[in-house]
Amino acid sequence: ELNAKASFGTSLPYELFEFAKNTGNKSYDIGDIYAGAQSYAELAFGHSRQLNKNLRIGAKVKFLFGIARADFQFEDVKADLSSDDKWTLSGRAKAEMSMKGFTYLSEEKEYKEEGRGTYQRVNDIDVNGSGIGGFGMALDLGAIYKINDYWTISAALMDLGFISWSNTMTAVNRGESFEFSGFHDINVKEERGETIKGESHKYVDQLTDFVNLQDEGDKGSRTTGIGATMNFG
């Protein structure tokens, strides 16, 4: 039996919705935000057996051929709006992609603040060729028990397995926090000290490092689960 599988999952903490709905002068420990997707093909061999007149059990062994796996994590996200003189947003962002021929494409941009130079940011992707990006195995286990002519119960453990991927293309944010403390002691003219333009450029550059991802290349192989589930009926 040959099948193609694809799945998508996300994890959004309750605190994220609380922050979006009730933004106020307090601290929010939002936690971890996650989104991921995967696709693979499976070659399955199964067998079932009647143990007695009431109980039947079955198992399926599956050989997995990974096509692609993508994970995005925004870890330890915090928003501190409790202070009167500054607001802080922090978190570690990481994107991981396992797929044959996959690469991130980057562009070089200049920081707004004079003298800070340039930075690289991921702005596109490229897939040079295609094929199998990983291999793995999985098991399906199940049982059906007939209580009487009217009642039958069943249980199944599905997709208990893993895929070992040959590459992990990784990108992370350069800066793990953004702090806004307002505009203080600024002047319109440059010769009289800090200007509004200069102060705003500092915030823009800080936000740039926080939200943009930088390519870190191939971090090597990794092993991921395919999402085991338990069903009862």
Where are these regions (language model features)?
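N-terminal accessory alpha/beta regions
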Residues: E1-A6
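Outer-membrane beta-barrel porins/channels
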Residues: S7, S11-G233
